[in-house]
């Protein structure tokens, strides 16, 4: 927001609405699958505090995101017929496209030693980002570049860092990838995470554009 705070759905909406009498917020409720009567969705099967039960309603809005949405559809019997049969999931609808065309934004974090005596630490300057079209690309604004300096146990330093020197970091991210992957189920157990095949940079044009950036 204008104060430099990273906003979320909880901060933006729930914090001002949680005291409404017609609103109940309950955590730790796990959706196992969508329930069908023939081919009509009538509710969901959920698990909460060790109990498994059904919630049926005229309207249920289920927001599973890019990963859990196809996972729940397949667990519920909607997806590639043979894959569901192999896991003994009752078929509701053969829909081969469920779980396909998974796309993400591959990125590279670059770290450099600075030739300047001092690197600026103005927070506003560090929030600058740039979208641009990679040379030779037919897709406009397909690349994003931003200043970033981030290290952790998951992303260790690429070069030894000297506390007496200054460094610059950049992030280059492909925002409109052509490579695509898929999501597949490991089992019919909804608590088991699905397998994700991202196929990053599988398309030669993605690889070329990342090199150009």
Give the residues covered by each predicted segment:
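Generic recognition of stable, solvent-exposed alpha-helical segments in well-folded globular domains
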Residues: 12, 67-71, 79, 125, ...
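FAD-dinucleotide binding site
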Residues: 1-7, 11-16, 22, 31, ...
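Rossmann-like flavin
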Residues: 1-8, 83-96, 191, 195-205, ...
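Conserved redox-cofactor binding core of oxidoreductases
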Residues: 1-49, 109-113, 120-121
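Short acidic/polar mixed-charge low-complexity motifs
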Residues: 40, 49-53, 179, 192
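Glycine-rich loop(s) and the adjacent beta-strand/alpha-helix scaffold that form part
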Residues: 33-34, 44-122, 188
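FAD cofactor-binding and catalytic pocket of flavoenzymes
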Residues: 108-212
